[in-house]
Amino acid sequence: MKQFFEFLITTFLLLGLAAADEHIVYWNSTNSLFRNRQPTIEVRMGDVVRFVCPDNEEGRNDGEYLIVYEVTEFAMDDCALESHSREVIRCAPEGTAEKVLRTQQLSGGRREDWKKQKVPPKNVAQLIRQLNPIPNGKEYQPGQTYYYMTTSTGKANGTNHRMYGLCESQNMRLSMKVSASQPHPTRRAPTRRQEDFVTTASAELMGGQEDEDSDNDNAHLLPRDLEGSTNPKFRRPSQLETAGVENQQFMKVVQMAQAGKTGTFENEKEAIAQKSSEKDGWHPVNVQYVADLMNNAYQNADERISYQRDFEIHEENDLAVKSLEYSSSSTSLSTNFAILLAVIYVLY
């Protein structure tokens, strides 16, 4: 029953690995693979390696009976089993019950079919996986090499032989190199130039504004008409307002440059703004207001307390700058009159 459940689990795993590669190793002395000095196969994670026993039909006198072991590199080089060597498959003479069970599994359990069906050679599949759902199943790691061999003599009575055997006489040993799984091909996004395409993401980074095609799901693949874009951030320089250099002024500069002349020219907008500010007013105080204030101060001198400022106004037309200077005096009319009386009293 245990073997039946392991067979079912293996079958489902193989169905799930239909896209993986399957490597079949016919483990018999006539396989040309063992003619190489160092028999080696290369597999990837997710592949399946199937070891197939020799085809020992009933009545054949040249049948081979053996056991395949997973061993260390040192044991494979010496063709000698170690205590922890793992048995992979036993290609020994099968009993009647074992043949019947295996034939039923292959024929789907129908009695009338398995009696007529030829029994195929015994085989076992090794799933090259890092995690194996089968209890005590072998787990493999990428980048590692695993070694297999048989020390059986090939005869029925020499199946359990633990040294030399077919490993030495027929070079029946194998190195299996495991590499990483086949990488899946990645889809590369189409290459876009910044000046030809505008994406929704770029619009968000530049202020959260999008143009008229942003509602399209494939908007990032559509070329935009930058001349007619509603977003000023995506307009061409021809759409932007001038920075104060008018066309006539620019053409004049070009003509001067072609004639070999040098010099500077003033930004017209800034010049106009500066003249307008000078015409509208000046700082710090309005001249007419100060003049009126002074006249009122002199007319009411007798009624004011003894502190009055004398102002002097300057206007420099050549620099278009108006300034205001002042000097202070702490004398008043009443104070001067008192001093005059005191002087007359002393003299007389």
UniProtKB/Swiss-Prot annotation:
It is a lipid-anchor; GPI-anchor. Glycans are attached at residues 28, 157. Residues 330-348 form a propeptide. Residues 207-237 are annotated as: Disordered. May undergo proteolysis by metalloprotease sup-17 to give rise to a soluble form. Keywords: Cell membrane, Developmental protein, Disulfide bond, Glycoprotein, GPI-anchor, Lipoprotein, Membrane, Neurogenesis, Signal. It is found in: Cell membrane. One of its GO terms (cellular component) is axon. Coiled coil: none annotated. InterPro entries: Cupredoxin (IPR008972), Ephrin (IPR031328), Ephrin_RBD (IPR001799). Residues 21-178 form the Ephrin RBD domain. Disulfide bonds join 53-91, 79-167. Residues 1-20 form the signal peptide. In contrast to other ephrins, does not seem to signal through the vab-1 receptor. Regulates the formation or stabilization of cell-cell contacts at several stages of epithelial morphogenesis. In early embryonic development, involved in ventral closure of the epidermis. During male tail morphogenesis, regulates precursor cell sorting together with mab-20 and allows the formation of distinct sensory rays. Probably acts as a ligand for lad-2 to regulate axon guidance of several neurons including SDQL, SDQR, SMD and PLN neurons during neurogenesis. Belongs to the ephrin family. This is Ephrin-4. It comes from Caenorhabditis elegans. The lineage of its organism: Eukaryota, Metazoa, Ecdysozoa, Nematoda, Chromadorea. The gene is efn-4.
